[in-house]
């Protein structure tokens, strides 16, 4: 499917079901490869409780996914967004942005200080994310890519810890 056709085709973004796990994992592996296991963000996700999983469906096929994970930044309760995955044949059509927007909307309904992520600033700034250089992740990360979307708290400082 082309990106132009995708824009005219509504995709359902729905909560992830337990039966979706294998398809989501395959999508994440295709997008990030096995190298993702070496990333600091993956260390956080391995220890944190998933608070939300969303998938994008094109018919019966899962073509996108995104998750929120329970964390704290300093003393501020928050959620950690990622990974965002979109099937190769559905990229460039805005689906990644739709998934981020759905997560942001869900996070604003939670009692959290905000949403933290590690990502490309020019992409995420359009959703309201701002630099969070003093949020200290438990491993190496490019601080310029650590971003915060305030929900109930300004940009926090301190260590990022997973909440099980």
Region spans (language model):
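Short amphipathic alpha-helix that is part of the acyltransferase structural core
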Residues: 2-40, 47-62, 153-164
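Short, solvent-exposed loop/turn elements at beta->coil junctions and helix N-caps
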Residues: 41-46, 135-137
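Conserved beta-strand in the GNAT
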Residues: 55, 61-71, 77-85
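Conserved acetyl-CoA-binding loop-helix of GNAT-fold acetyltransferases
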Residues: 86, 92-105, 117
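Conserved active-site alpha-helix within GNAT-family acetyltransferase domains
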Residues: 109-113, 118-143
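Non-DNA-binding regulatory cores of transcription-related proteins
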Residues: 133-150, 159-164
């Amino acid at each position: 499917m082309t990106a132009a056709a995708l824009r005219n085709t509504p995709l359902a973004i729905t909560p992830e079901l337990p039966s979706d796990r294998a398809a989501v994992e395959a999508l994440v592996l295709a997008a990030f490869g096995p190298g993702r296991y070496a990333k600091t963000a993956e260390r956080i996700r391995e220890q944190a409780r998933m608070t939300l999983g969303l998938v994008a469906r094109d018919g019966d096929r899962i073509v996108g996914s995104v998750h929120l994970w329970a964390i704290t930044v300093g003393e501020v309760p928050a959620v950690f967004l990622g990974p965002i995955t979109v099937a190769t044949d559905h990229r460039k059509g805005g689906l990644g942005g739709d998934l981020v927007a759905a997560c942001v909307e869900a996070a604003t309904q939670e009692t959290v200080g905000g949403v933290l992520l590690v990502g490309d600033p020019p992409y995420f700034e359009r959703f309201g994310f701002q630099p969070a250089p003093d949020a200290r992740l438990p491993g190496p990360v490019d601080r310029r890519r650590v971003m915060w979307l305030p929900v109930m708290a300004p940009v926090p400082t301190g260590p990022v810890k997973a909440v099980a």
